[in-house]
Regions:
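Predominantly the C-terminal beta-signal and adjacent terminal strand-loop region
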Residues: 80-85, 164-214
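Short glycine/proline- and aromatic-enriched beta-strand/turn motifs that initiate or cap beta-hairpins
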Residues: 19-64, 205-214
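Gram-negative (and chloroplast) outer-membrane scaffold detector with strong preference
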Residues: 20-21, 32-35, 60-142, 153-154, ...
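Generic short beta-strand segments
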Residues: 36-39, 77-78, 179-181
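Extracellular loop and loop/strand-boundary signature of outer-membrane beta-barrel proteins
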Residues: 43-48, 88-96, 141-149, 190-196
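Outer-membrane beta-barrel proteins
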Residues: 40-47, 80-86, 132-136, 183-189
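Residues that define the transmembrane beta-barrel architecture of outer-membrane proteins
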Residues: 27, 51-57, 97-103, 119, ...
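Cleavable N-terminal export/targeting peptides
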Residues: 1-25, 213-214
């Protein structure tokens, strides 16, 4: 009987340890990156203010205050690949765009909580900056590498998404995210983007995440 009790106790301990090892859902500190994304800037006038798209990639770190609330810092670079745009009321074919850098601090809220959830969904909003980087092909748009370099704008974002965790690899997960980016006007910027009026953009991204600390 004693041997049976000892065996059952050992099984219970192993089961409990295994359950703890396979805890899914968000932890306390999380790092991640999104190698796949796109940002679509809208609100131009097809004259001096140009609509354009960029390929986005970035990284983020998240600290969870509670099961429902977290603070996130994120950084991204978006590459202005060649595309067709309208500028000065005429179409410009296959021209590269400025690269776009973004920096945001966001508050993240999980309405249903995040701990122990396989697919916790969230809403988020934050403030930061958007910077356009001049390149040789963007000289005609006023973004001359010799005179402008970088031009920065105060910006906000709101959005939401979902994180996906699996029991087989509980510390790793995936993330799908959407942000509506609001770029404030900067009167010192070239007319190409957000000089006389604010602009906006839609960013969609897909990434991976790792729970650094539970």
């Amino acid at each position: 009987m004693q041997q049976l009790l000892v065996a059952l106790t050992l099984v219970a301990c192993v089961t409990d340890a295994s359950a703890q090892d396979t805890t899914i859902g968000a932890g306390k500190v999380e790092i991640g990156g999104f190698p796949m994304g796109g940002t679509f800037f809208v609100g131009g006038d097809d004259n001096k203010e140009v609509d354009f798209n960029v390929y986005s990639a970035g990284a983020n770190a998240t600290y969870y205050f509670t099961d429902r609330a977290a603070l996130e810092g994120e950084f991204s670079i978006s590459f202005g690949l060649a595309q067709d745009v309208f500028f000065n009321r005429s179409e410009v074919l296959h021209i590269q765009m400025p690269n776009v850098w973004t920096y945001f601090a966001n508050l993240v809220f999980f309405p249903a909580g995040s701990a122990g959830k396989r697919m916790p969904f969230y809403v988020t909003g934050g403030i930061g900056a958007v910077s356009l980087q001049s390149r040789q092909p963007t000289r005609q748009f006023g973004y001359d590498v010799d005179s402008v370099g970088f031009e920065s704008f105060i910006a906000e974002n709101i959005g939401g998404g979902v994180k996906i965790f699996r029991a087989s690899a509980p510390d790793w997960g995936f993330r799908a995210d959407y942000r509506y980016v609001i770029v404030n006007a900067n009167g010192d910027a070239p007319a190409f983007f957000a000089k006389a009026k604010g602009r906006s953009g839609h960013r969609v991204s897909f990434g991976v995440l790792f729970t650094w600390k539970r």
